[in-house]
Amino acid sequence: MLFSDTKVRIIAKKTRETIVFFILFIIFAAVNDISIIICTDSEELPEFQASDFFHSSELFRIYKDTPRHRPVMVVARCADGRVAAHLLAVIRRRSWLVPPFLLWHCRIVGEGDYTGFEEHRDELFNLMMTELVKWMPVHVEYIELSNFTSKMFGYKTLSGLGFFAVNWLNIHNSLHSKSPEERISSKLLGRINGAIAKGVETHEVRTEEEFADFVHLLKAHNYFKPKRFIPDATFFRKVVESGCGKLLITTYNDTTIGCCAYAVSKGNAYLWYAAYLRKSYLRLYPAEVTVWNAIKTAYEDGCQHFCFLDVGLPYRANKLRDFILGYGGKPVSAFRWFRCRYKWLNRILTHVWSF
């Protein structure tokens, strides 16, 4: 026998689940007469209520005004004109010092917004992602999706579209049941209090000079880190103006030694970008103080959770992940999905990450 009875039953079960999923998907699309439109200009956007900042028309317009960014809003619309769901993707152009000197990649944070149609999330996500993959320009090297609310959300859809899953880790700090002081490790809190006693302080960016220091440190710190993409200063200015984000800087003797930017969406804070002068100010712990004050600011603003969008690469030895967990956060197993432009490379990576 090629397969044992157990394997045959597992394969049969998965096949039945897949068939049922697509039958429900076809019925839903037929009954609601769902059409998918792809918007690349602000004037094309239909009116809709967005509960998720990462998939809002506001962030779309911010990306539109930011150099090297091309936002794409995928909208699922009913026959009567109602917007059933929308998903924001952004195509970013990066410059490299080695070939290829220019690289385009598409980034999606979260699974989209399904306000009023939450029970049909799977079917709507399938429709939107299928159209987005068809539409995607040929020069885009890869597509990346991350930070889903559920690990298994979209598994069938993304696997069927040629995406491969990489085991990842999401970390968030709960702010609703205990104060940050009750969760942080005593050793880390001692370091932070010691640095504050020496004159280190964190506050929101208030002046143009502080904003310039924020942008300079962020870009200088991440210049030789190809994994991290830092947008133009326009992006950060407009995020603050939208009221959906905050910029913090940590200073010592009027010198900026740390900074971070976090966004607020659906009652949660998301640490988006950060930079620190760790080596130059080793005993002042700029990273520890900056992140700690960001968590405290989010707590004081009434946020329910403080989430980290970047916890480092999925390796067993990960200093960034260990550092973040020191604040008492909760690690949650997750997938991060990728799809490469070149089919042969995509097949190789799919096999590599399937082990």
Short names for language-model regions:
Residues 23-32, 147-200, 310-355:
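Terminal substrate-recognition subdomain of acyl/acetyltransferases
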Residues 96-115, 169, 268-279:
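Conserved acetyl-CoA binding element of GNAT-fold acetyltransferases
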Residues 103-147:
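A gly/proline- and charged-residue-enriched helix-loop-helix capping module
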Residues 32-79, 89-95, 148, 152-166, ...:
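A conserved beta-strand-loop-helix scaffold within acyl/acetyltransferase catalytic domains
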